[in-house]
Amino acid sequence: MFAILADPIGGGFAASIAHPGGNITGFAALDSALGGKWVSLLKEIAPRTVRLALLFNPVTSSPLQFYMPIIQVAASSLGIDISAAPVRTKDDFESAISGQARSSGAGLIVMPDVFNVRNRDLIISLAARYRVPAIYFNAPYFARSGGLITYSDDYIEKCRLAAGYIDRILKGGQTR
């Protein structure tokens, strides 16, 4: 039983979302459709956006690989160019975000990653300082820290649902 697993299929834990196989059940944390929504929301709040950088940790690049196809489709349909902005250390954030600010029409998508969550206050303050509109993946953390806009699954609700699954499993019931 997993409450929130980033990519159960890509991680080899489940055969598919509809039919995971084996003795596993739970809730996936990644939904590729979110990538397209991040692009469209950012374009809606910053209509002059023509360039988006995807801020990601190359050590755990699976979120970038997971979301990139849908982000590229959405960006292309809105006339937006996409680039990757890898951040390996805390010091990399300033150069990545200030680099986006060097020309007009820039925006930033902060990709799902624990490294980005841990450094959210720095990321949010740099985006504000350099006036780069940014959208963040984890609503509870980034919204409470002052992020411009967030859009993600409701992780708290997923944990509540997982608790219900665990209760049923421990009582001998099925999760379907």
Show where each model-derived region lies.
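Short hydrophobic alpha-helices and adjacent helix-cap/hinge residues
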Residues: M1-R176
